[in-house]
Amino acid sequence: MKRRLVLENGAVFEGEAFGSLEHNMGEVVFNTGMTGYQEILSDPSYCGQIVTLTYPLIGNYGINRDDFESITPFVKGLIIKELCELPSNWRSAYTLDEYLKMKNIPGLQGIDTRKLTRMIRTAGALKGTFASSDEDIEAVLKRLNETELPRNQVSQVSAKTAYPSPGRGKRIVLVDFGMKHGILRELNKRKCDVIVVPYNITAEEVLQLKPDGIMLSNGPGDPKDVPEAIEMIKGVLGKVPLFGICLGHQLFALACGANTEKMKFGHRGSNHPVKELATGKVALTSQNHGYTVSSISKTELEVTHIAINDDTIEGLKHKTLPAFTVQYHPEASPGPEDANHLFDRFIEMIETTEKEGEAVCQNA
C-alpha cells in the first residue's frame, strides 16, 4: 500500500506503508546510527517525533524482548529506505513490521532518505504528517499547518508515581523526565539504591528521601517547558551531589542562570565525537537532542566538553558545588560506551563530598 510523507514546506515523499495505518503528525528528524533501531523506537526522548533512519537497510535483526529503553514507545512514526522482512538473530521475537503494528506506529519505506535528510539539514527540523496516496495534498498541508504540535512532552513520558529499584549502595534519586532504562541499568550495575521519581517532584520532597546523590535523566522537548523542574534543581543544588544527562543537562544549566536554544536539526546518532577540554581526549558518544545550552555567561558554570563537529556545549560543571552534567548519553543504548565511566565519576563525587562533610563535622 502506498503512503506519503507531507512536510510543512510542501515537499512530498511517496513510498510503501508498513507498520500501522495511522496518519500521525510530528516533528521529522533524522538519526545517523547504523544499528540500534529498537532502542531508538523505545527512547522517550523521541516523543512526538517522526524518525528518519539514514542507514539504508533496517530490521535486519528484528525486535527482541531485552533491548527496550521504555515499556511504551512514544515515537510518532518511522521512515526508512528499505525494510528487512526476514530478520536473522537468535534473540529476535518479532519483525520490525510486526512490532510497529502492535504499538500502532506507522512506517514508510522506499523513499529517498538521503534527500529527506539533506532537506532537514538545510531547512531545519520540519513538521510532517503521513497521508494516503489518494489524499489531496493541499488539504493535507492545510491540516498540517493549522495543527500545533504538543509541548511539554515530559509530562507525557515521566513516571506518574515514585518507585524503587533497590540496591545496597548509594541512595540515588533519579528524576524521570523521560528516562531511558539504560541509565537505571548503569546505576544498578553499581549497586545503587535507586528511587525513580516524577518530573514534577519538589525540592523538599526530593530531600525528604535523604539521597546521597541526584540524577537528572534525559527526556524530550524544550527544557523551558518544564519550569517546575528548574525550580526543583535550584532547591537541591549544593545540598546533594548532582549528575545530569541530556535534558537533565539543559535543565541544570537553566537553573544556574544559563540559556538554551533550539538547534537547526539537532544531534541524533551514535557516532558524535566529543572533546574533554581538561584532557584533550575525544570520545565517540550517543546523542539525541534538539536543544542545546547556548550561553553560560554570568554563571558559576564551566564548560567541560564540546562537540567536535560544531563546537556546541556538551558538558558542564559547577565551579564550587558538586554538580556536573553532559549533553550526550554515557549509558549509550545504543552506541559506544566511551563515556560509561561518568557513572563511576558520579559515585566518586558522592563519596568525596561525604568525606569532606565528615571532615567539616570533625573540625567543628
UniProtKB/Swiss-Prot annotation:
L-glutamine binds at S45, G219, G221, L247, Q250, N288, G290, Y291. Pathway: Pyrimidine metabolism; UMP biosynthesis via de novo pathway; (S)-dihydroorotate from bicarbonate: step 1/3. SMART domains: CPSase_sm_chain (SM01097). InterPro entries: Anth_synth/Amidotransfase, CarbamoylP_synth_ssu, CarbamoylP_synth_ssu_N, CarbP_synth_ssu_N_sf, Class_I_gatase-like, CPSase_GATase1, GATASE. Its EC number is 6.3.5.5. The active site is at C246 (nucleophile), H329, E331. Keywords: ATP-binding, Glutamine amidotransferase, Ligase, Nucleotide-binding, Pyrimidine biosynthesis. Residues 171-356 form the Glutamine amidotransferase type-1 domain. Composed of two chains; the small (or glutamine) chain promotes the hydrolysis of glutamine to ammonia, which is used by the large (or ammonia) chain to synthesize carbamoyl phosphate. Tetramer of heterodimers (alpha,beta)4. Interacts with BrxC. Small subunit of the glutamine-dependent carbamoyl phosphate synthetase (CPSase). CPSase catalyzes the formation of carbamoyl phosphate from the ammonia moiety of glutamine, carbonate, and phosphate donated by ATP, constituting the first step of the biosynthetic pathway leading to arginine and/or urea. The small subunit (glutamine amidotransferase) binds and cleaves glutamine to supply the large subunit with the substrate ammonia. This is Carbamoyl phosphate synthase pyrimidine-specific small chain. It comes from Bacillus subtilis (strain 168). The lineage of its organism: Bacteria, Bacillati, Bacillota, Bacilli, Bacillales.
